[in-house]
């Protein structure tokens, strides 16, 4: 619908202009008007985080997890037989027809990775930003079940333990982070 398209355009413009609070509201509106557009709920959560509205960010990220959102997308890509440029199709059937007619070649089905781990990590980072160490540690623990060797999660967890004065746990996690990325000075 026109209203949805207008809200998407306005939200994107606001986001690109670093007006995150307003962008989050527009992206939430898109989701409210079109529940199938769940990626806009993720956009709203991220914009809320950047707007330092951490409670809203946490609420939206948790909602994404509760509705089973993964963020996995599938793209159908082939090379235009005449121009050699990449072409994207709405469906496998459309792509296959173009290949069969020899209008396209080298078909590929591209499937993105799940966003679930990033969502769990962003919940933890929102709690850290709020200063809620206990909730952050629980969220990190949940996220590590999905991504046990995520460098950012390990560093975030180490920093919390440092703030809590648990130097033993801090050093243990730092050692693990160094093993994962020996050349990272973070």
Model-based region annotation:
Residues 1-31:
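Post-signal peptide N-terminal segment of secreted/secretory-pathway proteins
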Residues 30, 64, 143, 176-177:
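Canonical positions in the second alpha-helix
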């Amino acid at each position: 619908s026109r209203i949805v398209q207008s809200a998407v355009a306005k939200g994107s413009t606001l986001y690109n202009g670093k007006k995150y609070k307003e962008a989050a509201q527009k992206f939430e509106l898109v989701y409210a008007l079109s529940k199938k557009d769940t990626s806009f709920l993720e956009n709203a959560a991220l914009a809320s985080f950047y707007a330092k509205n951490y409670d809203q960010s946490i609420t939206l990220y948790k909602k994404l997890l509760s509705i089973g959102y993964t963020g996995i997308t599938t793209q159908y890509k082939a090379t235009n037989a005449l121009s050699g440029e990449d072409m994207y199709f709405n469906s496998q059937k459309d792509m296959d027809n173009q290949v069969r007619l020899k209008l396209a070649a080298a078909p590929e089905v591209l499937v993105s990775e799940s966003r679930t781990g990033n969502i769990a990590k962003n919940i933890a980072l929102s709690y850290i930003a709020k200063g809620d160490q206990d909730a952050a540690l629980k969220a990190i623990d949940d996220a590590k079940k999905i991504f046990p060797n995520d460098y950012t999660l390990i560093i975030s967890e180490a920093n919390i333990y440092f703030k809590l004065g648990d130097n033993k746990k801090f050093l243990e996690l730092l050692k693990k982070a160094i093993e994962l990325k020996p050349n990272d000075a973070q």
